[in-house]
């Protein structure tokens, strides 16, 4: 196989890996944490993964503390936690 063919194959494999959904066994443990607004009083619309409903949901984050199950976009939440 030529070097160009190998590069194409490598590129396709990389793309396939990026587009393959994360399975529940590969999901980071913090995806199981409950939503946590934290003690601060900000009003940031963010997303968390709800493991009971197997989906990303919006919640209001106060802006400090909380936990790692906190994403700025629904896309980031789905990419990280949703199967």
Curated annotation (Swiss-Prot):
GO molecular function, one term: serine-type endopeptidase inhibitor activity
Annotated compartments: Secreted
Keywords: Disulfide bond, Protease inhibitor, Secreted, Serine protease inhibitor, Signal
Domain of life the protein comes from: Eukaryota
GO annotation, cellular component aspect: extracellular space
Role noted for this protein: Serine protease inhibitor.
Protein name per the record: Kunitz-type serine protease inhibitor nigrescinin-1
Organism, as annotated: Cryptophis nigrescens
